[in-house]
C-alpha cells in the first residue's frame, strides 16, 4: 500500500502555450526546444555530445502539428531494453492503438517512421514514452514530414508533476495477474500512459510529467547498494542520472508546475523491513 501527497503550486500566468501564434511553415524541425513548433512533455534535455534531445522519463515526449500524411524522426535508441512509445493522432486517447518499438541502434541515428498513411491534411500528433527511465532512452536529432509543420497546438493550462515508483510509472499494468511472475516487468507489460498519474491528469484536463521508476524509494536507501532515491536526486533530469558525473545537466526548475503529487510509502516501507 502507499499514500499520495498532493500539493498545489503557483503555475504559469499564461493559460495556454502554442496554438495561437502565427509562425512560418517549415519542412523540418531540427530544434526540439523551439516552442513555436514543438510541445515538450516531461523532463528532457539536449545531449551535447550525441547532438539530440534526450527523452528518458516515463510519459515524456513531444507534440506537433503538420500538414501532410506522415511524420518521421531521426533518432538514436540507448539502453538494455526496447523503448516503447505511444502515438496519438488528432486527439486519440487509446495508448495501445498506435505503439512504436525502438530497438538498439548501436549509438547511430536512424530514420524511424512515427506515423504514416494519414489523410492528406492538417493533423496533430503526440508521441509519449511508455517505458521507464532505468532501461531505455531515445535521442531525437530532427523531425520531418512529407508536408509542412505549422504552429504547435495549445498545451493544457494545468501541468502536474508526479514523483513515484513502479506504480506511478505503470510498470506491469498490462500483464495477466499472477502472484509470482518474473515477466511482469518487461517493456511489453509496462505503460506509463495507463498509470494512475495518466488517468488523474486526464480527468483534470492537465498535462503531466513523471520522475521516478520501479524500485526507487522516496527517501530511504542503503548507500552500499542504492545510489539514488527520489529525494537525493530530484535535481537531476532522471532519477538514475548523475549531475556530478556529467550524465546530464542540473534540472532547470524555471518551468513551473501547478501541482505536485508524491507517491509515498511502498518501497520505503519494504526497505524498512529489510534494514534497521
Residue ranges and their predicted role:
Residues 5-8:
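C-terminal motif of bacterial Sec signal peptides marking the signal peptidase cleavage site
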Residues 11-163, 167-192:
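N-terminal secretory targeting modules
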Residues 57-59, 173, 182-275:
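Conserved SGNH/GDSL esterase-like catalytic core that processes O-acyl groups on lipids
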